[in-house]
Amino acid sequence: MAGKARVHELAKELGVDSKTVLAKLKDLGEFVKSASSTVEAPVVRKLKEAFPAEGSAPSSRPGGRPGNGARPMPPPRPGPAIGRPGPGSGTGPRPGPGGRPVPGRPGPAPLPGASRPSTPTAAPQSQPAQTQPPQSQPVAPQPSQAPRPAAAAASAAAPAPAPSAPAPAPSAPAPAPITSAPTAATPPAAPQRPTPGGPRPGPAAPGRPRTGGPGGPGGPGGGPRPGPRPGPRPAAPGNNPYTSPAAGPRAASGQGGSPSAPPRPGAPRPGGPRPGGPRPGGPGGQRPSPGQMPPRPGGSGGPRPTPGQMPPRPGGSGGPRPNSNMFQPRPAGGAPGRPGGGGGPGRPGGGGGGPRPGGGGFAPRGGAPGRPGGGGGAPGRPGGGGPGGGGRPAAGGRGRGGTTAGAFGPGGRGRPGRQRKSKRAKRQEWESGLEAPRMGAMVPRGNGQAIRLPRGASLADFADKIDANPGALVQVVFTQLGEMVTATQSCTDETLQLLGVTLGYEVQIVSPEDEDKELLESFDLSFGGDYADDVELSARPPVVTVMGHVDHGKTKLLDAIRSTDVVGGEAGGITQHIGAYQVRAVVDGTERPITFIDTPGHETFTAMRARGAQVTDIVVLVVAADDGVKPQTIEALNHAQAANVPIVVAVNKVDKEGADPAKVRGQLTEYGLVAEEYGGDTMFVDVSARNRTGIDELTEAVILTADASLDLRAPTGTEAQGVAIEGRLDRGRGPVATVLVQRGTLRIGDSVVAGEAFGRVRAMLDENGAQVSEAGPARPVQVLGFTSVPDAGDNFLVVPEDRVARQIAERRQARERNAELALSRGRPTLETILERMKEGEKTQLNLILKGDVSGSVEALEDALLKIDVGDEVGLRIIDRGVGAITETNVMLASASDAVIIGFNVRPQGKATELADREGVEVRYYSVIYQAIEDIENALKGMLKPVYEEAQLGTAEVREVFRVPRVGNVAGSLVRSGIIRRNTKARLIRDGVVVADNLTVESLKRFKDDATEVREGYECGIGLGSFNDIKVDDVIETFEQREVPRT
């Protein structure tokens, strides 16, 4: 071809299939997509050079079309052959195992025009090892009548003698060894290993007749060839990429002792490739190893040999689809040492292919007859012209004409070849990989079973309780409750309870106290509780808490008892911390220790007073004689009564003018405190903290009340437990906690945990700053060694080791974090979404709180959050802590536009310089109510201004003038007030507002512009583009004035 050519046209011209051409082009470095692709002329020349013989030598179709100038087939290359040795002597057919001859399939009739061998085959030597394959000239095969299947089966019963003279054979010629005179029914000789280089005799498969002589199976009436000798067959090399992995070893008929049944006539030949391709040896004999076989035509690795370079075609089944330029005429008979093979079945629709001329058909693999092939093909058609081949094996293979085993090398034996996955199989695998996991797992139902869950529990926690899959619960929450929740996300109490109702469980949310108790029980620990019977109890001093209204003299009274001056050190003259002291009072000549706890009286320290009432034994309620009962007095009284502790009332400031102690007694009677002199059981003591009068009576009343109503005993030999009264961050000492030991003895070196803080006791200090080595019950001390500042009111206890303390603290932190996440998350509804949208629009003040002690920070936070100046402004505390203001606080405030509030603390290091550089405002306070007042004023200043309308004046329209390029101008008379230019106006007609939000754009007095016109004067008023002005209309002007927020 001179120009471009398509691949399939080149394949037809070269006498090969398109796949071979595509493979050769790939080897030549030319990429071609498919058989319909075109290639350039230089590529065509390169391809023809690679196939010189195929492109020039003529060929004839199998089936009998004579070819002109057929070249003789070259002899096979001599080489070592590994196979079963043939008989040592004798020319008769070899019997199969057991002495029975194997019925063979009749050979095909020679086609018209078939050539005869030009020269007779030479007789071999007596030893097969010395036999050399003779040369033969290809001739056209002669047509002959193919025997019917019944006749073939009958003729297969008797053995046929070996041919002694050349005879016409319906096949392409191939040299065949001629043995000596046959001996019928002679048992086979002992196996003998052939000498390398000799011919490879080997039996054909059952049902395959032997060819090559007159009267043989290739001709009419040919007898069957004996079956193969028993024994395994080694794997032969194969390079067929399309070999089915299901094709296993040959059936037992080719290797075992019993021959298989003959295949059905017309059935497709098993395991054979498409007709017309390179043929491997037929089954039945032991195949040689790769190194002992002659080079295979069409194999991988090198250019395809020309027909002149190829050895005689083996008798195996066909390969690629035949065409008119593909085959050369061959003499009858198989290659030396190789049996003849049957032809492959035809293409679908073209009928079953007949056996190749000169060879018998294959027996089915797997030992069972396969599926029948197509009908006999017409002479001259590729693959046709004879009865159908052998049956197809049940073990699979390729469709449309059988397997391709042998097309590119024998397959199905030894190592299984790789099989291509079909598009359907790949699609199914892909779809199965994309299949979503099924979530329809069954969730166990509960019949009112109770489940205890902590605050902020997740669906995974719920699933652990009911032994279910968390993913199933996620699906239930989504489908039943309509809420998207992950398996590890903290859920609100409402969500957990609704899920329990849906599944039939009663969900009980564990309180923080019970949750902490369960946590300690998991470590074999407990806090509080009754004492064991075998625990030795010792007397302890009473714990007394002083409570009352602000400025009623609580701290001054404690100073009088302790003979100190604490009030002088308090900022603003008010107590802002919980102070714990232990004093010794002499009662009835005996020195008795008493522990006093001072609580703030300001309204913002409610939590401190509540904690003071919980840890105390007796409450001393201080009431000023000149001021009487106040709100914080009632609040402190309620705390004491809620704690169920006895109360002693100290009426202070009795030395002041206007003091009325009797009035105080009368007021407290209304709240259930009846004085002893009034017939009650409450002790009232009149004291003066300034003059230090009545102090001894007060301490005596405390001791008498404690002895009369309390059992003041506690164990001292157990691990210490108590409560953290206060916590602060000391610059030189780190976190410092003021604790009150309630039971046991606290010693230096103990591992302690208090709330979310833990550590080891490094030092202990008393109220005077002196170090102590141990602290017994009812003893307040300052403890150093915590990793963080404990919160005021946290319980502390001693644990066996630091590891346990750390684990308890971490679990408490996780518990609080989950609870906060659950509260902050909530259940999203339309109302909450709208509220969040409104919150995004309103102004917000961000604060960072730093204080000296945890109790003060807590009180300040609670007080600030109670400030309410309206819904337009919000207050958010983004961080709080104990200790000095650090650079980290400044950076956080800079990132969030927050203001830092320092309560009794100062900046640390370069925090001041960083705050100035970042523009962060830092405010310092020492009195809590000053901080509250400033923050409240700041919030009010952030409120949006409120405007109200103020009327300026009215004017009556007397005449309407039309001015070009200006519009209508109202000639008016000012009736009241002032009419100003550029002010807002509205037009009123018959008492109805016609137009509102107008602007007085022009104001003239005659022809002069005027800024304002007063009452009683005439003027011209222009309202811009508004021209609907009529006589007797009233123009009213007004302005918006800002109203201060209160």
Curated annotation (Swiss-Prot):
Region (G3): 598-601
Record's compositionally biased regions (Low complexity): 52-71, 112-139, 147-159, 177-187, 244-253, 320-333
UniProt subcellular location: Cytoplasm
GO cellular component: cytosol
Stretches for region G5: 688-690
This protein's UniProt keywords: Cytoplasm, GTP-binding, Initiation factor, Nucleotide-binding, Protein biosynthesis
Top-level taxon: Bacteria
UniProt region (Disordered), positions on chain: 49-448
Region (G1): 548-555
GO molecular function: GTP binding; GTPase activity; translation initiation factor activity
Primary location class: cytoplasm
InterPro entries for the chain: EF-G-like_DII, IF2_II, IF2_N, P-loop_NTPase, Small_GTP-bd, T_Tr_GTP-bd_dom, TF_IF2_bacterial-like, TIF_IF2
Membership in a protein family: Belongs to the TRAFAC class translation factor GTPase superfamily. Classic translation factor GTPase family. IF-2 subfamily.
Name of protein: Translation initiation factor IF-2
Organism of derivation: Parafrankia sp. (strain EAN1pec)
Gene this chain is encoded by: infB
